[in-house]
Amino acid sequence: MMGLGNFIKGLFGKGEPSMSTSEPVTEAINTNLYKVNSLAFEQEVVKAETPVVVDCFAKWCAPCKKMAPVFEEVAAEYENQVKFVKIDLDQSKDIAKQYHVVGIPTLLLFDSGEVKEKLVGNTTKDKLKASIEEVFKIKSE
């Protein structure tokens, strides 16, 4: 639920858009990184034609904030091969429950609509790249 302060900021265009809505929301962060809400998750992740890496995070989570630049760097290296998606679990508790995410940050590697690997906790760039290359059988560009 949106707090009064966030509501007022959103009303006057001073806050970031709320991802908790009754409509699917996909927000492009850059050319290969997107933030989605739970209503857009199936279309953007489960039904995606390419492999997808999902960053399950929360805004208040310090390790998630530390992981964010690593996730963005790796997303740039696999453009046109792997799609990268972020989902705020505070606003998408149904996704956390469905995919058994109990700690954050958690990275989910999806291929053909199924989770092929789950990385829990802060993941280094090298470990993330190794997992992507092993699970999806690809190399960075």
Question: What residue spans do the PLM features occupy?
Answer:
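Hydrophobic anchor residue in the Rossmann-like NAD(P) cofactor-binding loop of oxidoreductases
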Residues: L89
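Proteins that catalyze or organize thiol-disulfide redox chemistry
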Residues: M1-V53, K59-A62, P69-Q81, K93-D94, ...
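Conserved catalytic/dimer-interface elements of ABC ATPase nucleotide-binding domains
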Residues: L108
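A short glycine-leucine-enriched loop at secondary-structure breakpoints
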Residues: Q98-V102
